[in-house]
Every structure is written in structure tokens, then in C-alpha cells.
Regions:
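Rossmann-like AdoMet
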Residues: 1-91, 95-138, 151-152
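Conserved beta-strand signature within the Rossmann-like core of class I S-adenosyl-L-methionine
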Residues: 181-194
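Conserved catalytic loop of SAM-dependent methyltransferase domains
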Residues: 232-258
Length: 284
């Protein structure tokens, strides 16, 4: 029996990025392929006709490319960390129905997926935890989840499309707490400047009647802005769209490569990498 999801529910918010990853896989198979997303779409009882109609537009297809590159970039960072920390904890912050942990599984790492309880309930039904894996129902800002993570072999945290919905002080508090709790760990996530965040969250902000867009997390110069948060942070970043792949692929339109340059440049779309120092810089 298929898992039924009603429209205009919290569960529906999980379907949107899932459908995006499915379309990424179909349109750009040489760049990104999410077998789990493709399978889950077939197992969910939901009217995807509106999504299917929108998917024909050029800008929507560029949106799918954005999704593909974000997931591919973050997976690249996870795999890189696992090369030097094969027994590390791989932690998906705000996981939804994303299976990046599975895609990067090296056979020895430990996988953790964290999200709100109602989200984890859906995940448990559709993506039950496997071997060396744990689904944790918790608000990310409630740091009690720290105690659930076995970081004895290292800790690699990643968040895809999550921090745009956080206030800047919330991101700062969480990052600083993680740097203290997981020395030698690493956090990677996507970010963009204020103009881009306003465009991305336009509908959400309107529906939530939020007027102070400037309070939400945005980054222009990651190294300068985030290094000031803590002496334990080593900050670097790479372009979100072209920093890991030049997109010279037969499936990618030249116009999309142009838009990618605009995104990485004018919008400061980036993958931010925060390495947590093993010791406080002032002590080194």
C-alpha cells in the first residue's frame, strides 16, 4: 500500500524537495542520481500533476539543476571527510526524506538523520533506519541531540537547504555549540547572500507574515563573517553551482551555465565549510 500524503500539510513539504531530486536524476543523470528519491516517489500516494506541469518550465529545470549541484557538492564533502575518518558519524541536519547518508555509506561510518518529530515519523515509515543508522526526532536548536552522536571516529555534519529558515543568532548558537562539542568535526551547508535568500523565501515569508527578512541567516563573505563567531572555526567556501563541477555536460544548457555564474557571483551561492578545531586557536 502506498503512503498517503495530504496537500497543505507538513508532510507535503517533504514531497517538494523529494520530487526535485527525482527530476534532477532524470534530467541530469551524469551529474546526480538519487535512486532513493526515484523509488519513494513511486511509493507515495500524492497528486504530483501540478509538479509535473511546472517541471516543463526552463526556470524550474534550472531549479532542479540547483538541487542536483547542492546535493552533489555536499556528498562530495562527506565522502572526502570519510576518506580520512572512515568510522566517523555522518549527520544529516534537517534530513527530511534525503538519503545522502546512504549514498555516501562506506560500510563503516555511522549515519544519523535529525529532524522534527513529525518529519521523522514519516521517515520511519518510508525510510526506516538501517544498519549503523539512527533517525533522531528533535529540533536542531535543542542540543540534547548531541548526546545521541557517537563522534569517537570523527563527525561530519551537513545541512541542505536548512539554515535559510533560521535566524542568524540561532545558526551562530548552534554552530558554536557544535564546535565545542565535536572538536575535529566538520559542518558543511549551502548559503547565499541577503538578496538571494529574500528571493528563495519570498512565498514562505509572505505566508508567515514575516517582514524582517534581514533577521534570517545569509552570507556574503563566509570567511570574514563566520570566523568572528568562534576561535574554534576554520572557515572556507566554494561556489555552490560551479565550485565542484564546471557543468560542461551535454545535458546542461549553456544558458544554465551562465545563470550558474550569476548565482555563484552576484548571489554568493556557496557551500560553506566549517572545520572545528581540535583545540582553541588561542591555545595553539
Amino acid at each position: 500500500m502506498k503512503y498517503h500524503i495530504e496537500k497543505n500539510t507538513v508532510q507535503e513539504t517533504l514531497v517538494i524537495p523529494l520530487y526535485g531530486r527525482k527530476m534532477c536524476s532524470e534530467l541530469y543523470p551524469n551529474l546526480f542520481r538519487d535512486e532513493t528519491a526515484m523509488r519513494l516517489i513511486e511509493e507515495i500516494d500524492y497528486d504530483f500533476s501540478t509538479f509535473a506541469k511546472r517541471s516543463q518550465s526552463m526556470m524550474q529545470q534550472f531549479g532542479f539543476l540547483e538541487c542536483a549541484m547542492r546535493q552533489s557538492d555536499l556528498a562530495c564533502e562527506v565522502r572526502d571527510y570519510l576518506r580520512s575518518h572512515p568510522n566517523a558519524a555522518v549527520v544529516n541536519l534537517g534530513c527530511g526524506l534525503d538519503a545522502t547518508g546512504h549514498a555516501c555509506d562506506n560500510g563503516t561510518c555511522k549515519i544519523y538523520n535529525i529532524d522534527f518529530p513529525d518529519v521523522i515519523a514519516v521517515r520511519d515509515a518510508l525510510l526506516p533506519a538501517g544498519e549503523r543508522e539512527k533517525n533522531i526526532p528533535c529540533n536542531l536548536n535543542d542540543t540534547s541531540w548531541f548526546s545521541e552522536i557517537d563522534a569517537s571516529g570523527g563527525a561530519m555534519f551537513f545541512a541542505a537547504g536548512v539554515f535559510y529558515y533560521f535566524l542568524t543568532p540561532q545558526v551562530k548558537a548552534l554552530v558554536c555549540a557544535m564546535a565545542e562539542a565535536f572538536p575535529g568535526g566538520k559542518l558543511v551547508f549551502d548559503a547565499a547572500n541577503r538578496k538571494a535568500v529574500k528571493l528563495m523565501l519570498k512565498t514562505w515569508l509572505k505566508n508567515a507574515e514575516i517582514k524582517d527578512v534581514g533577521a534570517y541567516f545569509a552570507v556574503t563573505d563566509a570567511r570574514r563573517e563566520l570566523s568572528a563567531w568562534s576561535d574554534r572555526l576554520r572557515v572556507s567556501s566554494r561556489g555552490y553551482m560551479l565550485g565542484y563541477n564546471d557543468l560542461r555536460n551535454q545535458n546542461v544548457r549553456k544558458f544554465f551555465r551562465f545563470l550558474s555564474k550569476v548565482g555563484d557571483g552576484m548571489m554568493n551561492m556557496q557551500i560553506v565549510r566549517l572545520d572545528f578545531a581540535k583545540e582553541n586557536k588561542k591555545q595553539e
